[in-house]
């Protein structure tokens, strides 16, 4: 894969750690392809779901992939970009028994499971950082924590002080009850999060919180 477009700015070959993407839906499927185009490899994917026709509008899948597992479709799309990419699939989804190291990208729908992942990673010296992505219809949030910084991890856990049911109740839905989401919101928060990841890899500095609303041209980071 020819990386000359960005190699002088970001060299993925310097990243020796594994990358774990937990959930390959709206956020995770698009994130996986962005990291692939950057040249990242040694990627672990976790998901147990299948591609449905409704997913094609906001997830990185195609109509011909309806019925595939999301892992099958994501791996196919990543391999089209970089045939030499190294991917490990976990079709059972994330389980507490999984042993992880490196970077953990949280792209799950369920806040309770997100919290479980962070608690499992806490105090694990082999986890470098945790990057969390959440979105509504027009706004989204990205949170990041250096896993060796206990204060940062506790700050991340503090943002998860609500239940999955409370989160669902706050999401806008269509007349038929489908959760609404659009690509401008998805791509904006992913771009912000991946830029945060790159900055951390290059300088060890990062933003703990990034809030975006592409429809009002708002990005706030601190």
Q: What spans do the regions from the language model cover?
A:
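Adenine nucleotide-associated cytosolic modules
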Residues: 1-222
